């Protein structure tokens, strides 16, 4: 937080002994759990009970791992219970519905305990336990993860997402026609443009086997809540999405011999969990830089890495390995931040000491 924001936040005189400049960790984690439970509620509404059971199994595994960690470590913050529930929900939502429930529980339990005991609990860990668990499950049973739905021929066309909709690869809601007509008449017509049928369904539920990738509209609304109320910082997600979208739009056609500068941004953002990753995974507590320019560099690097790891969309595990890759790079960025801040502080101190002598 900048000094100007801090000064504005603390400008009111009250009888309270402390002034909080941001929400507590427990409050932020409870909000995250609530928003993730909305994703689970849509699983119930769409009768995706298998995915819901997997989410329950991963939450149970996360809580068991936390309870065992607390038995062996005395000084553990009480705030981590809500964080454990959030981590369990994230893990379950990132898994396809074909995974075995029993295997998912035990592999998640093993991954979380390994992460806690080897790397440290919560913010002490440089690795995201949720994506680590998904990566372990993927390596042991990659067959349950769906293959990329887009082909090279699709990417060479001008509008791959529309082609997937028209071919039936992406499901269309029964109310899509009326909803599209309503949006065109009341919204897009004022800007002189129209959207074809299928895009409303694309935003609402793209039918992915992985729950975290399905409900893009809910993820967008959730991001507005998280970022508008200051539960998370906007720098890394904003820079990441801008860099990744720009590379998909202008650079990706050169790799697939497609139409120049006509890469499909919607396909890249609305499939493969791009938005979900940007909101919930990419800047997990303790795994990102702390300074503004460190966050900008982290976001740029993540956008470039996503372009080469994830590609142009529809990947089922690309963002899992993206987050793990950024987790390994982030400590180097944080170390550089510390050295630069220390060097800057030493220079200012020497300048002040020299001024006092004069």
PLM-predicted stretches and their roles:
Residues 1-71, 342-358:
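N-terminal signal-anchor module of multipass membrane proteins
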Residues 25-29, 197-221, 225-234, 262-263, ...:
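Membrane-water interface at loop-to-transmembrane-helix junctions
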Residues 35-42, 62-66, 84-93, 108-115, ...:
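Hydrophobic, membrane-inserted alpha-helices
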Residues 48-60, 98-106, 203-217, 261-274:
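Structural signature of hydrophobic alpha-helical transmembrane segments
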Residues 77-87, 103-107, 124-134, 234-242, ...:
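Cytoplasmic-side transmembrane-helix entry/capping segments in multi-pass membrane proteins
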Residues 124-220:
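Long hydrophobic alpha-helical segments that form multi-pass transmembrane helix bundles
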Residues 126-131, 265-274, 295, 312-326:
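Loop-to-transmembrane alpha-helix initiation sites
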Residues 248-292:
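A beta-strand-loop signature enriched in Asp, Gly, Thr, and Trp
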